[in-house]
Amino acid sequence: MTIVYLSLGTNMRDRAAYLQKALETLADLPQTRLLAQSSIYETAAWGKTDQADFLNMACQLDTQLTAADFLKETQAIEQSLGRVRHEKWGSRTIDIDILLFGEEVYDTKELKVPHPYMTERAFVLIPLLELQPDLKLPPNHKFLRDYLAALDQSDITLFSAQQTEF
């Protein structure tokens, strides 16, 4: 089994419902088990700032799927929940990013792991580190909390405390 960390985000319509449905669908993936989910945080939009605030969270899973197959599954979940890829950093019903896939490193057109922007985004690192405070970034094994310490966290607020139902 491979431990996988995901970031989930949404800023359209019933944001909390999209996160919940994404978690439920992730928990039902073949050869995959949802291990933990973070609290939900509300954050200002990143990249393209003239849009609604996001809800963001992280989750931890273990899977026997390959990284490529796992990516296909997450993209299918996004599509089933109405995700339309029309604008970079635009509004979305759900965004599921693979942050870490075990200790593996991928740099292909389709898949970049560790996620290339995760160390620049407090809205990713805060929920991720809630799940695993001592997490390190492969391949350099620098603590992710050290990246977070250098980031502005002022626009991130707790929306809903951690839940364990899955």
From Swiss-Prot:
GO BP of this protein: folic acid biosynthetic process; tetrahydrofolate biosynthetic process
One molecular function GO term is: kinase activity
User: What pathway or pathways are given for this protein in its record?
Assistant: Cofactor biosynthesis; tetrahydrofolate biosynthesis; 2-amino-4-hydroxy-6-hydroxymethyl-7,8-dihydropteridine diphosphate from 7,8-dihydroneopterin triphosphate: step 4/4
Question: Which Pfam families has this protein been placed in?
Answer: HPPK (PF01288)
| Keyword presence, Lipid biosynthesis | no
InterPro entries to which the protein is assigned, alphabetical? Hppk (IPR000550), Hppk_sf (IPR035907)
| Gene3D superfamilies assigned | 7,8-Dihydro-6-hydroxymethylpterin-pyrophosphokinase HPPK (3.30.70.560)
Q: EC no.?
A: 2.7.6.3
Reply yes or no: does the keyword Disulfide bond apply.
no
Which top EC class is named for this enzyme in its record?
A: transferase
Question: What keywords appear on the UniProt entry?
Answer: ATP-binding, Folate biosynthesis, Kinase, Nucleotide-binding, Transferase
Query: Which reaction(s) does its UniProt entry say it catalyses?
Result: 6-hydroxymethyl-7,8-dihydropterin + ATP = (7,8-dihydropterin-6-yl)methyl diphosphate + AMP + H(+)
Q: Output the superkingdom of the source species.
A: Bacteria
* Similarity comment text for this entry: Belongs to the HPPK family.
Role description: Catalyzes the transfer of pyrophosphate from adenosine triphosphate (ATP) to 6-hydroxymethyl-7,8-dihydropterin, an enzymatic step in folate biosynthesis pathway.
Write down the NCBIfam families for this protein, in alphabetical order. Answer: folK
This one is known as 2-amino-4-hydroxy-6-hydroxymethyldihydropteridine pyrophosphokinase
Q: What gene is it encoded by?
A: folK
